[in-house]
C-alpha cells in the first residue's frame, strides 16, 4: 500500500496594503517553501508567515495538539527559554544553511516584551548568486497559547552606483 502524500497546509491571504502573503501551518512546509525559493533564485523578495506549534511542545504532548498544556505561553519562563533556544539553534541555523552562508549571523537582534506577547526580531544582510538582500525575521509568542508566529521577509538591497 502506497504512502499517502502529505499536502502542505498553506493559506494565501491579502493584507490591507494589497500584498499577497502565504501563511504556513507547519514549520516543515514553511522551510520547504523557503528552500524552493532559494533553488528558484527568487529568494530576495519574499514575505511569508508561519503559525505553528514548536517541535518541543508537540514532543511533550506526543504530537497531539489537544494535549498541549495551557501553561505553554509567553508567561511561562521554561516555555520562553525553550522557544528562544529553538529559534536560535534550529530555525536560524536552518535559514543559514538554506542560503549556504555560515556568515549569516543575524547580528541585529532585539527583544520586545509586553504582558500580551514576546517578540524576537532578527535581521541581517547577505549575498547569494551576486544578489544582495536584507533578511528580517520576527518570532512572536503570546500569553494565550503555545502557537508561535514567524514573520519572514527578504528584500533586495539596491546596488551602489559608482562614485564619479
UniProtKB/Swiss-Prot annotation:
UniProt KW keywords: Cytoplasm
Main subcellular localisation: cytoplasm
Domain of life: Eukaryota
InterPro entries: RGI1, RGI1_sf
Subcellular location: Cytoplasm
GO BP terms: energy reserve metabolic process
GO cellular component: cytoplasm
UniProt function note: Involved in the control of energetic metabolism and significantly contribute to cell fitness, especially under respiratory growth conditions.
Family: Belongs to the RGI1 family.
Record-given protein name: Respiratory growth induced protein 2
Lineage of origin: Eukaryota, Fungi, Dikarya, Ascomycota, Saccharomycotina
Amino acid at each position: 500500500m502506497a504512502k499517502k502524500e502529505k499536502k502542505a497546509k498553506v493559506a494565501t491571504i491579502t493584507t490591507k496594503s494589497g500584498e499577497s502573503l502565504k501563511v504556513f501551518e507547519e514549520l516543515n512546509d514553511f522551510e520547504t517553501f523557503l528552500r524552493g525559493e532559494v533553488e528558484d533564485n527568487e529568494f530576495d523578495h519574499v514575505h511569508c508567515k508561519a503559525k505553528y506549534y514548536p517541535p518541543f511542545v508537540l514532543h511533550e504532548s506526543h504530537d497531539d495538539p489537544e494535549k498541549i498544556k495551557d501553561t505553554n505561553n509567553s508567561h511561562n519562563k521554561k516555555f520562553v527559554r525553550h522557544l528562544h533556544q529553538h529559534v536560535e539553534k534550529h530555525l536560524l541555523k536552518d535559514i543559514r544553511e538554506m542560503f549556504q552562508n555560515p556568515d549569516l549571523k543575524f547580528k541585529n537582534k532585539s527583544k520586545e516584551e509586553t504582558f500580551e506577547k514576546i517578540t524576537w526580531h532578527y535581521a541581517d544582510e547577505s549575498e547569494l548568486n551576486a544578489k544582495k538582500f536584507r533578511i528580517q525575521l520576527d518570532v512572536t509568542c503570546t500569553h494565550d497559547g503555545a502557537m508561535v508566529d514567524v514573520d519572514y521577509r527578504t528584500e533586495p538591497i539596491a546596488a551602489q552606483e559608482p562614485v564619479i
